[in-house]
Structures are given as structure tokens and as C-alpha cells.
Design a protein with these regions (language model features):
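Basic nucleic-acid-binding interfaces
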Residues: 2-36, 47-79
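Minor-groove-contacting beta-hairpin "wing" of winged helix-turn-helix DNA-binding domains
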Residues: 41-45
Length: 79
């Protein structure tokens, strides 16, 4: 969990140049469900948060998607 928290803070400070595997590792550490339905996106959901977030699985992940993921993790932590 500590490593995931450090990675999350690094994402918050610099949303550039992250891989989808990094987002998945942080999500799993915080108990967030990760779905790869076979398309080009990865879906992150959590039962206590109404809306999930979808991130394109191709690289590079645009900073807007990384920021949306960080906001989603923050909502999960507050719920």
C-alpha cells in the first residue's frame, strides 16, 4: 500500500509518461476493480463510488486520463 501511495503522489505531481500497468497496480492496491473487456480501454470501478473511470490502454496515456484516475482514487479513499 505504501508503494501505491507513493506512486499515486507521483502521478499527482507529474501526470506525464505513465503506463496502464502502473494505473492497474495502484488501483488493485486501493481495492479498485480493474476490467479489461477486450477492447482498447481499461475500466476502473469501485462499489462505493457511483461512477468509474475509463482509460485508453495505449501508450502514451494522456495527462487528462491520469488526472481523472487520480481524482477517482481520491473519491474511493474518501468513501
Amino acid at each position: 500500500m505504501r508503494r501505491a501511495a507513493k506512486t499515486l503522489e507521483a502521478m499527482r505531481a507529474n501526470p506525464l509518461d505513465w503506463r496502464i500497468e502502473d494505473l492497474e497496480a495502484v488501483a488493485r492496491a486501493f481495492g479498485i476493480n480493474v476490467r479489461r473487456p477486450g477492447g482498447s480501454h481499461v475500466y476502473f470501478t469501485h462499489p462505493r463510488v457511483r461512477e468509474g473511470v475509463s482509460v485508453p490502454a495505449r501508450r502514451p496515456i494522456k495527462p487528462a486520463y491520469v488526472r481523472a484516475f487520480v481524482r477517482f482514487v481520491d473519491r474511493v479513499r474518501q468513501a
